[in-house]
Amino acid sequence: MSTTDETALVMGIETTDDRGGVVLCCGEEPLEQREFGPGASHARDLLPGIDAVVRAADIQKSELDVVAVAEGPGSFTGLRVGVTCAKMLGYTLGPAVVGIPTLEIKAYNVEPAEEGSGAHVCPVQDARRGWVYATVFRSTGERWKDLTGVLAGPPEDVAQEVPEGALVFGDGAEKFNDVFTPERFRTGDESLDDPTALWTARLGLRRVRAGGAVDPMELQPRYYRPTAPEENLQRRSAQKGN
């Protein structure tokens, strides 16, 4: 089946935060979905979740037209699990495969049309160890346009890149609310924080229709910073060199 068909079968996989989920869509409309609870073990829950939505929809995995996965930033372990699963499905079964930035998925928790053309939103994600990830998006009235790519660094530095009056939300904005203040920005509530498998699938289908599918073996998780052990090793190496 062509991915331009409104009945294209699309699977969305989201494993970048401590919840996550999987959805099966017909076009952009959800058929079946499974959401994992707080503290989910993605390595344990993802494959049974995929089997559950496929079985509930009475299809075979081989009928999938698109597999979309949240590619990061996010939980290092969750990213590896989700991306590896998407690669496996793409390589063995042949659907179009695409990775979607986690912050873009979060942006669509806010409707571009409701914000109005020209409005800005900025999901801010806690990156641990005193950093945040963020991306600034501008509404075209129909979609969110990425203006900055992923910004990664101390919250004070990242906040300088966000236009005043932008709607900021996410666990990073909440954690560093002394930086992302209501005096400078509009602040969203916790209902906007989590990326969803549904928007992963919808954006994945749109990306594939625009020619953005990738070779499954080239799909990679996007971490945007080293792990804590890697940072410690880099620090020790730098100290030895001085």
Question: Residues of each region from the PLM?
Answer:
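Surface "functional belts" at beta-alpha junctions
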Residues: T3-A8, E29, S41, A96-D194, ...
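A glycine- and small-aliphatic-rich helix-loop capping segment at beta-alpha/alpha-beta transitions
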Residues: C26-P30, V83-L93, S139-E142
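Residues at secondary-structure transition points
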Residues: G37-D45, F76, R80, T84-K87, ...
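Phosphate-handling active-site elements
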Residues: R55-S62, G90-I100, E115-G116
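Acyltransferase
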Residues: G188-N242
